[in-house]
């Protein structure tokens, strides 16, 4: 046998033995398939449909099991009861952010999504309060979304009812809402800076969704030595941060401490208030990372949901017709939809919820981590262990949602046609790490979808039975297949 191969195998075995001793000494991990040296269970997992693999392993090992993505163990939680117990009942213990080496390399542990400890708690509290205050300000977030919805309608009218790919236009609207909240102004859809920002965000989202990213995250030691699209992600992120820094400097020059205009102003004021605190988490570097996180989390996820939602409405014409009937009855054709309308529109509300449930946008959540040694069911999860929660197993639970693979707003309606809440509805996750922008995203989805369907009929040149709604292969988020449609003014 080749001496080099012998050396590699020997070192791999020693590494696994060391990890096993370390984990067995500190805790009792759940059962799982036997990992291979270095690569762990990667060959046993369908990286194009990880949720399917999780479902398979849950039938063998139960709702809590261990997989090795590379040499590091990850505890997987499957099913509503186990997910709720982990994220709600043990929310503090599992409030750490799991490892994501590519992102960690870009933001150095800063920002809102991938930070930990005191840093994360302070940034999360600040962001929640800031967004809440904007919702109650002179110009509320709802006003900004309504303005963007009107601009979106005008852009769609410019298509003149011709066949078009809606990807770009539907990406612009949520991104512009974020721009309004963060930068104080929206952009024209043809603005050069806006187009460049959109291009970088869209490209990064696609790359981060690729199976290659799963390999990079499982084997981070090899990142620096491998060519590949991960290098493009790092470059794009640097350019996004550079643009954000330019906007921050503009804000610094015009800042009025008594009249904050947007998220950046509020952050700069907080920095000034804490300038004598040597341990402050509010720095320029932290601001850039946080704003970048707000863009990534608040634009791509919402635009993908919109795009997927229109595809489902294009296929299920009977649902679209019922929504339009309810809109015509409650709002009419000429008044702008507002959030107060939602309580009088149970079918439309159910439709928006069903889109989110059905598409299951982030099927396996963003990884969590144990902040201490955690006793979870019959196991002891060592501090620092990554935890992955299967949101698919909750959103597609066949007991809560009969025929979960079928798109049916009836999943959220009672026998009298009233809207019916469900504890299983957790597309924004649950617990301490629940999405900060949930309220904003819910508002955007209701107002933008309702405004589009109020103003346009959706038409496809493909027979509805032939419209494919199967998501494209990905690892992190579910993306709809490419499609074209016509927006016919009503």
Curated annotation (Swiss-Prot):
Inducers of expression: P450 can be induced to high levels in liver and other tissues by various foreign compounds, including drugs, pesticides, and carcinogens.
Catalytic activity: an organic molecule + reduced [NADPH--hemoprotein reductase] + O2 = an alcohol + oxidized [NADPH--hemoprotein reductase] + H2O + H(+)
SUPFAM superfamilies per UniProt: Cytochrome P450
Positions bound to heme: 435
Alphabetized InterPro entries for the sequence: Cyt_P450, Cyt_P450_CS, Cyt_P450_E_grp-I, Cyt_P450_sf, Cytochrome_P450_fam2
Family matches, as Pfam families: p450 (PF00067)
Enzyme Commission number(s): 1.14.14.1
Example of a GO cellular component annotation carried by this entry: endoplasmic reticulum membrane
CDD domains: CYP2C-like
Entry keywords, A to Z: Endoplasmic reticulum, Heme, Iron, Membrane, Metal-binding, Microsome, Monooxygenase, Oxidoreductase
Membrane topology qualifier: Peripheral membrane protein
Cofactors (names): heme
Domain of life: Eukaryota
Annotated GO MF terms: heme binding; iron ion binding; oxidoreductase activity, acting on paired donors, with incorporation or reduction of molecular oxygen, reduced flavin or flavoprotein as one donor, and incorporation of one atom of oxygen
Subcellular locations according to the entry: Endoplasmic reticulum membrane; Microsome membrane
Protein family: Belongs to the cytochrome P450 family.
PANTHER family in the cross-refs: CYTOCHROME P450 2C18, CYTOCHROME P450 508A4-RELATED
Primary role: Metabolizes arachidonic acid mainly to 19-hydroxyeicosatetraenoic acid (HETE).
Protein name: Cytochrome P450 2C55
Species this protein is from: Rattus norvegicus (Rat)
Lineage of the species this protein comes from: Eukaryota, Metazoa, Chordata, Craniata, Vertebrata
């Amino acid at each position: 046998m080749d001496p080099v191969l012998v050396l590699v195998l020997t070192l791999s075995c020693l590494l696994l033995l060391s990890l096993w001793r370390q984990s067995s000494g500190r805790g009792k991990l759940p059962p799982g398939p036997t990992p291979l040296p270095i690569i762990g269970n990667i060959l046993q997992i369908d990286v194009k449909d990880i949720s399917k693999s999780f479902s398979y392993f849950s039938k063998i090992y139960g709702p809590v099991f261990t997989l090795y993505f590379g040499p590091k163990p990850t505890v997987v939680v499957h099913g509503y009861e186990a997910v709720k117990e982990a994220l709600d009942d043990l929310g503090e213990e599992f409030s750490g952010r799991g490892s994501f080496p590519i992102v960690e390399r870009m933001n150095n542990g800063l920002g809102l999504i991938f930070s930990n400890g005191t840093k994360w708690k302070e940034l999360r509290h600040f962001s929640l309060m800031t967004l809440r205050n904007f919702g109650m300000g002179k110009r509320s977030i709802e006003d900004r979304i309504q303005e963007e919805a009107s601009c979106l309608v005008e852009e769609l009218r410019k298509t003149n009812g011709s066949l078009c790919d809606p990807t770009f236009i539907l990406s612009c609207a949520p991104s512009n809402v974020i721009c309004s909240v963060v930068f104080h102004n929206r952009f024209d859809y043809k603005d050069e800076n806006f187009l460049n920002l959109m291009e970088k965000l869209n490209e990064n989202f696609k790359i981060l969704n690729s199976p290659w990213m799963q390999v990079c995250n499982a084997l981070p030691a090899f990142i620096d030595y491998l060519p590949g699209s991960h290098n493009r992600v790092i470059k794009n992120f640097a350019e996004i941060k550079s643009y954000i820094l330019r906007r921050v400097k503009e804000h610094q020059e015009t800042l009025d401490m008594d009249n904050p205009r947007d998220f950046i102003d509020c952050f700069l004021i907080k920095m000034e208030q804490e300038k004598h605190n040597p341990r402050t988490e509010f720095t320029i570097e932290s601001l850039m990372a946080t704003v970048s996180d707000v863009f990534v989390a608040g634009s791509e996820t919402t635009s993908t949901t919109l795009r997927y939602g229109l595809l489902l409405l294009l296929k299920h014409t009977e649902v679209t017709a019922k929504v339009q009937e309810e809109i015509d009855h409650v709002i009419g054709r000429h008044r702008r939809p507002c959030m107060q309308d939602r309580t009088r529109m149970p079918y439309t509300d159910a439709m928006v919820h069903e889109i989110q449930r059905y598409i299951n946008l982030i099927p396996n959540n963003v990884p969590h981590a144990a902040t201490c040694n955690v006793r979870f069911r019959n196991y002891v999860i060592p501090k620092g262990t990554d935890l992955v929660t299967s949101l698919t197993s909750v959103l597609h639970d066949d007991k809560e949602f009969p025929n979960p693979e079928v798109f049916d707003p009836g999943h959220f309606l009672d026998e009298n046609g009233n809207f019916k809440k469900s504890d299983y509805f957790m597309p924004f996750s649950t617990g301490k790490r629940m999405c900060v922008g949930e309220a904003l995203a819910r508002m955007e989805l209701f107002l933008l979808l309702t405004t589009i369907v109020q103003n346009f009929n959706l038409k496809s040149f493909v027979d509805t039975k032939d419209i494919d709604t199967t998501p494209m292969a990905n690892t992190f988020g579910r993306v709809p297949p490419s499609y074209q449609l016509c927006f016919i003014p009503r």
